[in-house]
Amino acid sequence: MKKLKLHGFNNLTKSLSFCIYDICYVKTAEERDGYIAYIDELYNANRLTEILSETCSIIGANILNIARQDYEPQGASVTILVSEEPVDPQLIDPTEHPGPLPEAVVAHLDKSHICVHTYPESHPEAGLCTFRADIEVSTCGVISPLNALNYLIHQLESDIVTIDYRVRGFTRDINGMKYFIDHEINSIQNFMSEDMKGLYDMMDVNVYQENIFHTKMLLKEFDLKHYMFHTQPEDLSEEERKVITDLLWKEMREIYYGRNIPAV
């Protein structure tokens, strides 16, 4: 697509949202509590702020405000308001203060923003634990959130990823012609590095006429050691390893396809 000469500001809104999952198997209630405490500390509000601040640098956005909060018993959220143009440092709020409660998040959606919420959880009986990071990067103007895609997936050590990208609104050129998208895209995968594509099985569901793009990703390589917490696979019997592997694969496929799979 040729470079457009716009009439005024680029009014398109580009939103990239995705869920990133980390899966783990634990043998005891103590291991479960230990995993949740570990993952909650690993992705606390301070670390997430560092990741999102670097994301702003990658996409060329200027930080206006940062709100962050660690929650009890677990979970964290960070919201960063950003602008495309440089801003007067005197107008920036550099202080730290609690992030929004879930019902208050909509108050941030009228600006360009980057936000993340984390959700550690566990199965009541089967020993399965999942950590989900829910991330949204929404920008107005020429800034593209797709530039941060590889960085965010790598930083959050993802087993499964579901990604949605949408362009909303329209902008006009100097002749008054409306444009509902200002760049070429037929798949989110086009914005991923080759090494990233090699790590995951991927599936697209796109609605081109609505400028809606969806990609699902499932890690190809399965190493049981990667999914155990404080237990080594070699300390388990062959039958135990098979049972745990089957449980993990079923859990991962259910998350990937977004539906429960009946036991065979």
Curated annotation (Swiss-Prot):
Pyruvic acid (Ser), modified sites: S112
* Top class in the EC scheme: lyase
Q: How is the cofactor bound?
A: Binds 1 pyruvoyl group covalently per subunit.
- What is the catalytic activity of this protein? S-adenosyl-L-methionine + H(+) = S-adenosyl 3-(methylsulfanyl)propylamine + CO2
Q: Which one Pfam family would you cite for this protein? A: AdoMet_dc
State the InterPro entries in the record. AdoMetDC_fam_prok, S-AdoMet_deCO2ase_bac, S-AdoMet_deCO2ase_core
**Cellular compartments per GO CC:** cytosol
Provide this UniProt record's keywords sorted from A to Z.
Autocatalytic cleavage, Decarboxylase, Lyase, Polyamine biosynthesis, Pyruvate, S-adenosyl-L-methionine, Schiff base, Spermidine biosynthesis, Zymogen
Provide the active-site residues from the annotation: S112 (schiff-base intermediate with substrate), H117 (proton acceptor), C140 (proton donor)
EC number(s) reported in the record: 4.1.1.50
Essential cofactor(s): pyruvate
Q: In which pathway does it act?
A: Amine and polyamine biosynthesis; S-adenosylmethioninamine biosynthesis; S-adenosylmethioninamine from S-adenosyl-L-methionine: step 1/1
- What does the record say about PTM? Is synthesized initially as an inactive proenzyme. Formation of the active enzyme involves a self-maturation process in which the active site pyruvoyl group is generated from an internal serine residue via an autocatalytic post-translational modification. Two non-identical subunits are generated from the proenzyme in this reaction, and the pyruvate is formed at the N-terminus of the alpha chain, which is derived from the carboxyl end of the proenzyme.
GO biological process, any: spermidine biosynthetic process
Transmembrane parts of this sequence: none
- Site positions (Cleavage (non-hydrolytic)) are K111, S112
Please give the Gene Ontology molecular function terms for this protein.
Answer: adenosylmethionine decarboxylase activity
Subunit structure, briefly? Heterooctamer of four alpha and four beta chains arranged as a tetramer of alpha/beta heterodimers.
Q: What does this protein do?
A: Catalyzes the decarboxylation of S-adenosylmethionine to S-adenosylmethioninamine (dcAdoMet), the propylamine donor required for the synthesis of the polyamines spermine and spermidine from the diamine putrescine.
UniProt lists the family membership as follows: Belongs to the prokaryotic AdoMetDC family. Type 2 subfamily.
User: Which NCBIfam families does the UniProt record give?
Assistant: SAM_DCase_Eco
Q: What is this protein called?
A: S-adenosylmethionine decarboxylase proenzyme
Q: What is the source species?
A: Enterobacter sp. (strain 638)
Query: Encoded by which gene?
Result: speD
